[in-house]
Regions:
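A glycine-rich phosphate/pyrophosphate-binding beta-strand-loop-alpha-helix module
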Residues: 2-53
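A structured beta-alpha segment of the ubiquitous adenosine-cofactor-binding alpha/beta core
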Residues: 52-69
Length: 234
């Protein structure tokens, strides 16, 4: 529902009307948010119809919308890679393609272990389908013994499927071998790739190779490491 409000605000601020179509999971919330925004717009002297909401969970509505040449100026798909590519492939109206999120969390050797576990758990489990959910966890080798055993148990208790390199597999018999394709995959689900790295430089190189420039995270108590990560990683 926050995307409904964000999208409407951005469109109005840029001088555009907007047609909103949200997912079925948040249909009622989206409908309410859109109605409130339309009412507020009208109160500010903007036509209420400048903000419209498609009140159906039928996917055919999306197919109809992306073929309304002459009526719809541009479509902006927001969501997982599957939705985005389906719109890009099938639309006859112009599309602004949003990026997929292969997002990483790097647990540095100087991280607070308890904090790192909370962050790494939330980043994967809270909302695994969103584009800024973590897809790969990178762990410095010097903190792996303190961090990984408990972290893997936490993931297992929440039915997270773990794919890891050989070093990670030594910590649990429930870790599946990771593939080259896994590193660049946006799972959008309770599945996670895990890698142990020798240094922050290796972590940043991995992110540069497989990341999509979306959302990246470092967990550390080392100010210099945090600054290096912040100013190096896209």
């Amino acid at each position: 529902p926050n995307v409904t409000a964000d999208a409407a605000g951005l469109c109005l601020k840029s001088g555009n009307a907007v047609i909103l179509k949200g997912g079925s999971e948040a249909m009622e919330s989206n409908k309410t948010v859109a109605a409130i925004l339309a009412q507020a717009a009208e109160g500010a002297g903007i036509p209420a119809d400048s903000i419209q909401f498609i009140d159906t969970s039928d996917r055919q509505a999306v197919q109809d919308l992306i073929h309304m040449n002459g009526l719809v100026d541009v479509v902006i798909p927001r969501g997982g890679a599957g939705l985005i590519q389906a719109v890009v492939r099938n639309a006859s109206v112009p599309v602004i393609e949003t990026g997929a999120g292969v997002c990483h969390t790097y647990v540095d050797k100087d991280a607070d272990v308890e904090m790192a576990m909370k962050i790494a758990f939330n980043a994967k489990v809270q909302r695994p389908s969103v584009c800024n959910a973590m897809e790969t966890l990178l762990v410095h080798k010097d903190i792996a013994d303190k961090f990984l055993p408990m972290m893997l148990m936490m993931y297992n208790s929440s039915a997270v499927e773990i794919c890891g390199d050989e070093a990670v597999q030594e910590y649990s018999g429930q870790v599946h071998p990771v593939t080259e394709e896994d590193w660049s995959t946006e799972y959008g689900d309770l599945r996670l790739s895990v890698k142990i790295v020798d240094s922050i430089e290796e972590a940043m190189a991995h992110i540069a190779k497989y990341g999509t420039g979306h959302s990246e995270c470092i967990v550390t108590n080392n100010y210099q490491a945090a600054q290096l990560f912040q100013y190096t990683v896209d």
